[in-house]
């Protein structure tokens, strides 16, 4: 689903210190700060460019190797938050076609202690969460990692836990081409002039996602995190294209772009690979390659899903697609076709793709009869059954009729054999006002919340 861009601000302040604080940079090429970590923390080398203070008993000074950066790979930086409150940037080489992809042994550790619970997994045609194998319900709140008020994030998870919603999908990307004002949340900067990309791990960067993961652990909610958007909201493919050239359809095969994308995947996966709060990683949100052969997305998905599994074999991986290009039950309408470069059944057969996803927006797709959606759900359930993998009804919504037609789709999802559903999207009042709102939003505590969420949960619990 396309999302409305929103910006959250945070003033980053701090006092200088002779020691590097928790999770701060403490070494690496060109680094001139302190290599001594605070008491109870030690300096661990993650690569030649970056060492970080991690939990441990002693402080050590990392060694620096002299391995040169491949000349054919774009520069990718990690912006680390230090105790002075000032971001320090250090360049690291991203993987390129001529450079072996990094293995999981070289990935950085999770930045937060992991909570209780177990890794979610596929169990036949269903999902197993913390020892329970059954049908699950959840929602989308793409905007949550961009909130700067911790209390707002805590409130969202309080409400999800109370409602029994076990799965939450949030954006794991926020790409920009111009450095925003200090304190503006972004995750990665693609600089066209410098030909570099910078990953922001500061207080207005991935530390916001850190808090979301920690809150999910606390409340027993599992997160789905995609790495890039096909739409321009929050950067998308175009943010890469503006910096490195090509087009949105060439994004999947552009070597420089893919090396930057893989470097970002490694940075995020390495932070949370030990967290039980991660339900699954997704290659992207609604990947499309308009007019392309289906081999393009299939080949890309095969390569990237295997790469993610090499970094983190414990969590599930999904494509994050809309479910287009389905032959089973096809009525030859636009969603069943392959014009957007997807072949649902072929992609589902990729060994490192653990489950299928489907989205449903009749109005946006030019479908006049909302009842059409019931067949869409049923036919995907059949395809997943044939593949022996679960199906996640990952996004669905309509402009109005939340309490009529959407409830019918939910009942179809329950009865057809899909494994879970996530309504688009969750909304609530925040300290700054309403959360990002579109025509599909279901706000907590409203009449629509009761019918579209609470009534649905009653049916889920009976299932």
Swiss-Prot record:
> What are its E.C. numbers?
3.2.1.78
Q: Which residues cross the membrane?
A: none
Q: Which residues form the signal peptide?
A: 1-18
What residue stretches are annotated with the CBM1 domain? 19-54
Quote the cellular component terms of the Gene Ontology held in the record.
extracellular region
Where located? Secreted
Q: Which GO terms describe its biological process?
A: mannan catabolic process
Q: Which residues bind substrate?
A: 171, 285, 361, 424
Q: Which residues form the active site?
A: 286, 395
Span list, region Catalytic: 119-463
Keywords, alphabetical: Carbohydrate metabolism, Glycoprotein, Glycosidase, Hydrolase, Secreted, Signal
Q: Which residues form a coiled coil?
A: none
Q: Where is this region: Disordered?
A: 57-78, 93-121
Spans annotated as Ser-rich linker: 75-118
**Where does this protein have compositionally biased stretches of type Low complexity?**
59-77, 93-118
User: What does the record give as the reaction this protein catalyses?
Assistant: Random hydrolysis of (1->4)-beta-D-mannosidic linkages in mannans, galactomannans and glucomannans
Glycan-bearing residues: 87
Pfam families per UniProt: CBM_1, Cellulase
Q: What class of enzyme is it?
A: hydrolase
Described by its record, this protein's role is as follows: Endo-1,4-mannanase, a crucial enzyme for depolymerization of seed galactomannans and wood galactoglucomannans.
Domain note for this entry? Answer: Has a modular structure: a carbohydrate-binding module (CBM) at the N-terminus, a linker rich in serines, and a C-terminal endo-1,4-mannanase catalytic module. The genes for catalytic modules and CBMs seem to have evolved separately and have been linked by gene fusion.
Q: Which family does it belong to?
A: Belongs to the glycosyl hydrolase 5 (cellulase A) family.
Name listed for the protein in its UniProt record:
Probable mannan endo-1,4-beta-mannosidase F
């Amino acid at each position: 689903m396309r999302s409305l861009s929103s910006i959250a601000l945070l003033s980053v302040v701090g006092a200088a210190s002779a020691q590097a604080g928790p999770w701060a940079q403490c070494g690496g090429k060109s680094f001139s700060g302190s290599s001594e970590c605070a008491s109870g923390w030690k300096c661990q080398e993650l690569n030649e460019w970056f060492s970080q203070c991690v939990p441990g008993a002693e402080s050590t000074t990392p060694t620096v190797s002299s391995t040169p950066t491949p000349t054919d790979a774009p520069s990718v930086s990690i912006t680390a938050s230090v105790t002075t409150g000032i971001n320090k940037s250090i360049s690291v080489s991203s993987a390129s076609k001529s450079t072996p992809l990094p293995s999981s042994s070289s990935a950085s550790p999770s930045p937060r202690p992991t909570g209780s619970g177990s890794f979610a997994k596929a169990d036949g045609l269903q999902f197993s969460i913390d020892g329970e194998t059954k049908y699950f319900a959840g929602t989308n709140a793409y905007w949550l990692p961009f909130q700067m008020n911790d209390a707002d994030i805590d409130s969202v998870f309080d409400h999800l836990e109370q409602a029994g919603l076990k799965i939450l999908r949030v954006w794991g990307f926020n790409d920009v081409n111009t450095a925003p004002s200090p304190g503006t949340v972004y995750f990665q900067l693609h600089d066209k002039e410098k030909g570099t990309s910078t990953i922001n791990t500061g207080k207005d960067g991935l530390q916001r996602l850190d808090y979301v993961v920690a809150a999910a652990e606390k409340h027993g909610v599992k997160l789905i995190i995609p790495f890039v958007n096909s739409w321009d909201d929050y950067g998308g493919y175009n943010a890469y294209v503006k910096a490195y050239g090509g087009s949105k359809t060439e994004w999947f095969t552009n070597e420089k772009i893919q090396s930057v994308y893989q470097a970002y995947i490694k940075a995020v996966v390495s932070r949370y690979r030990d967290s039980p709060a991660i339900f699954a990683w997704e290659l992207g949100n609604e990947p499309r390659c308009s007019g392309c052969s289906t081999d393009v997305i299939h080949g890309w998905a095969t390569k990237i899903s295997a790469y993610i599994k090499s970094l983190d074999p414990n969590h599930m991986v999904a494509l994050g697609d809309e479910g287009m290009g389905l032959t089973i039950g096809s009525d030859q309408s636009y969603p069943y076709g392959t014009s957007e470069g997807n072949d649902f059944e072929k992609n589902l057969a990729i060994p490192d793709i653990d489950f299928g996803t489907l989205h449903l927006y009749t109005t946006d797709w030019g479908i006049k009869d909302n009842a059409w959606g019931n067949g869409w759900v049923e036919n995907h359930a059949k395809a997943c059954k044939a593949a022996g993998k679960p199906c996640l009804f990952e996004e669905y919504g309509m402009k109005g009729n939340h309490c009529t037609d959407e409830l019918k789709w939910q009942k179809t999802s329950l009865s057809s054999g899909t494994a879970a559903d996530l309504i688009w999207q969750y909304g609530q009042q925040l300290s700054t006002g309403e959360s990002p709102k579109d025509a599909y939003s279901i706000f907590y505590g409203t009449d629509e919340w009761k019918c579209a969420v609470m009534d649905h949960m009653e049916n889920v619990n009976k299932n």
